[in-house]
């Protein structure tokens, strides 16, 4: 069944445009509250957000919805997504909410939901919520004496700071490291610099002056140019770029070069394997991760399990098969020893631990493999199903046959935008570019004719 509201990472869209309206946010609160209002105990929801202007509006709407459904609401204010997941468990809540559109510009916003175990909701539970959203929710409202209360919770940032600090091995200190960190004017603008400073680093911070409209604006993990300049300017040993809700990270080495999530997973996998912390004798990544990562792991006797795109699917596979390292090329790194979802800061701390323990530079530590040439292009669509067209399917089959022994092809609809993503990788860059361009042309022609 096609889903109307939920994508690969919750509900997302332009603020004050369906589905990201206060009316729907309130209805999501009622619907989700109804589903998790089970048992005889007093029910609770924890609600966090990033720094977007629309966060105030959506926060109040969701508080109204959940309290109307009979849940007490704990309001956290701006805080990283992994902190919401952690606090959902530690505060014994029935459900957790993060209001954020992650790396998107401020005009967008989104709703991510976590179960009482701190994990993102399954497709089945999201389908239950969608089913309720199509019904009359007035029958689900709490009785007058059962309406929930709302309370703003103080001190939650300190809880997350202590949690993050505990993930750095006790024999490691960050003294002697100059770290430049870009907080994307987002949810981690207070906590991330504090963690690094308390662990002994010399910290230089940018992207820590949110005003409601500058989240991810020329800063953060999707726009690391400002961080590259700052690393060069202050001669930092490393740069750390988070995104708006701090669930992903990109590293800049001392030379200003960017290190993506694939390289970071390689570092952590190798380091944890050496210390016998790695479980599953490998890691979990998505179909978008570079073939070079797969070859790197294979050469060291480790496996790479692939899932469809979305960190929630990475986490599901990790839980099912007992892996403790997983992630995405984009910088979502999930370390299940320390959390239930991607955590950019905690992942960065594992890289810093490897740097300190080896005594090598960040560039030496983080360049674990040579990436295979990879090209990703998007085709914007306004409707229809071009991937079901016979002409497109034949072009895809021909491309897959050509790449069978030397590369990979991934074509998929975006889960968050009206796009079709075309990615190919292989040892021959010219071949990859030709294949992608031909497929883009075929899909575009079918789209235009539709």
UniProtKB/Swiss-Prot annotation:
It is an enzyme of class 5 (isomerase). One of its GO terms (cellular component) is cytosol. Mg(2+) binds at residues 102, 243, 245, 247. Keywords: Isomerase, Magnesium, Metal-binding, Phosphoprotein. HAMAP family: GlmM_B. PANTHER family: PHOSPHOGLUCOMUTASE (ALPHA-D-GLUCOSE-1,6-BISPHOSPHATE-DEPENDENT), PHOSPHOHEXOSE MUTASE. Catalyzes the conversion of glucosamine-6-phosphate to glucosamine-1-phosphate. This is Phosphoglucosamine mutase. It comes from Rhizobium etli (strain CIAT 652).
